[in-house]
Regions:
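Parallel beta-helix/beta-solenoid
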Residues: 87-88, 96, 114-115, 120, ...
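Extracellular beta-strand-rich solenoid/capping regions of secreted or surface-exposed proteins
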Residues: 59-67, 79-93, 100-122, 126-147, ...
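Detector for outer-membrane/organellar transmembrane beta-barrel domains
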Residues: 228, 330-333
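N-terminal secretory signal peptides and thylakoid transit peptides that target proteins
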Residues: 1-16
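Extracellular beta-strand/beta-solenoid scaffold signature
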Residues: 103-111, 131-141, 156-163, 178-189, ...
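C-terminal segment of N-terminal export signals and the immediately downstream linker at the start
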Residues: 22-44
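Acidic Gly/Asp/Thr-rich repetitive segments characteristic of extracellular carbohydrate-active
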Residues: 41-75
Length: 456
């Protein structure tokens, strides 16, 4: 019994000593940058905060790290550099908010041609306002797969912020500010996600999803914050938009916060099957949400729009534009005028405009100085339903084209309140040519089918 007790005491003491030894603190060791981010660029004579131009040593370091299939890690500091090229597999990594590449001139700060598996992460890229050639980005990537630009701060580009052409990949978590042209442009995407970026003070468009010819694109543009977009080059709507899809089919634009644009929040031009959903839009000075020209298929749903010249426009049946659902949007505080030169007839002050093969349902529209909802433009009206909407304080609640050749519209189960110019009227283009058709619930025009509507 004594031996067992002695053994137990000795074992306990030894364990306590070992525990105390293990608990003794060791001197703290800073994890080297190379072990956390990649191969340390200072191994290649790259020097942070050097007054010298480091283009040559940076390029040598980028090439060596890519050959070794390692990211190149740039320690905190500023690096003066001209044009750099990312080879296949090139990855350039910095410390977010602390690693700055300052552009000294060249075609682009960082470019690639035909390189896949390339990444920029955690870098501040300062374009210094140096003018770039036309159609050139401070970051300029062409013909690549698995291309990623993430968590970077891009400022002061004298051209485009980021230019992609024939790229598959991701642009996410970046801040792009003060660009002379568009903040982010993609041509002929091969599968692209544009997400959670902050874009401010662009002098053309915020995000452009473009194709050289009409076709499937499939880019997803989600959860971005886009503010202060100017129409620097002028024009009648091709500039000054937060998000612009041109000839790009099957694009999804969802969950974006958009504020203060000279023209539209989202503009789809010949962009079939575009989905514009769940966006928050405020203070845009032309059409807030636009689907126009030669498109087939659009969903515009569950957006909020506060201050615009037109809330939603689905136009150009004469060009083949057709087939849309406009559902569940809240649109208010509509301006009586568009910017000068954008619309020959200045058809502003409207909540929703549609023309062909359209369902307009469950929207709430308030304070439209012209029309709450407008269906058709001259003879360009076909198969439109307007049901279950709430229209408050519009001059005219619902206007429907009644010119010869115009097609059918069903108007039913809407609540129309405070429309001094009439609840439901017939139109010749933007001009009212009938009395209030909703006064007695019947229509003398065969193509207008009136159901039960509440008017007060």
């Amino acid at each position: 019994m004594d031996i067992s007790r002695r053994s137990l005491i000795n074992a306990t003491a030894a364990g306590a000593a070992a525990g105390a030894l293990a608990a003794t603190p060791e001197p703290a060791r800073a994890a080297p940058l190379t072990s956390t981010l990649g191969r340390d660029a200072t191994q290649y004579d790259v020097r942070p905060n050097s007054p010298d131009d480091q283009t040559k040593v940076l390029q040598r370091a980028i090439d060596a790290a890519a050959s070794a299939q390692m990211p190149l890690a740039l320690p905190p500091g500023a690096y003066r550099t001209g044009a750099l090229r990312l080879p296949n597999g090139g990855q350039l990594v910095g410390v977010r908010g602390a690693t700055v590449l300052k552009f000294t001139g060249g075609a682009s700060l960082i470019a690639s041609e035909g390189a896949s598996g390339i990444t920029l992460t955690g870098l501040a890229l300062d374009g210094a306002g140096i003018k770039l050639a036309d159609r050139r980005g401070l970051v300029h990537f062409q013909n690549g797969l698995d291309v990623r630009v993430q968590d970077c701060d891009i400022v002061g580009s004298g051209g485009y912020g980021i230019w992609f052409e024939s790229i598959a990949g991701e642009v996410s978590g970046n801040t792009i500010r003060k660009t002379a042209n568009t903040a982010f442009t993609s041509f002929d995407a091969l599968g692209l996600l544009v997400a959670q970026n902050t874009i401010q003070d662009a002098s053309d468009n915020g995000i452009e999803i473009l194709r050289h010819t009409m076709g499937d694109d499939g880019t997803i543009v989600v959860n971005n914050r886009i503010d202060d977009i100017k129409a620097g080059p002028g024009g009648s709507g091709q500039h000054g938009n937060a998000i612009n899809a041109f000839r790009a089919g099957n694009v999804i634009v969802s969950g974006n916060h958009i504020r203060n644009c000279d023209y539209s929040a989202v503009r789809g031009n010949s962009a079939s099957n575009i989905q514009i959903t769940g966006n928050s839009v405020s203070n845009v000075r032309e059409v807030a949400l636009y689907s126009e020209f030669a498109f087939e298929g659009a969903v515009i749903a569950n957006n909020t729009v506060d201050v615009c010249a037109v809330g939603v426009s689905v136009a150009n049946f004469n060009e083949g534009g057709r087939m849309v659902t406009v559902h569940g949007n809240v649109i208010r505080n509509i301006l009586p005028k568009r910017p000068i030169g954008t619309a020959p007839d200045d058809d502003a002050g409207i909540g929703i405009v549609v023309e062909a093969d359209a369902a307009v349902t469950s929207n709430v529209i308030e304070n439209a100085p012209s029309f709450g909802i407008m269906a058709g433009w001259g003879k360009y009206l076909r198969d439109v339903t307007i049901t279950g909407n709430v229209l408050r304080n519009s001059f005219v609640g619902i206007g429907v084209s009644v010119v010869p050749g115009a097609g059918t519209a069903l108007v039913s189960n809407n609540l129309i309140s405070g429309s001094r110019g009439g609840a439901i009227v017939g139109l010749d283009h933007a001009k009212a040519v009938t009395n209030d058709l909703g006064a007695d619930g019947t229509s003398r025009f065969a193509q207008i089918v009136l159901g039960l509507n509440a008017v007060r």
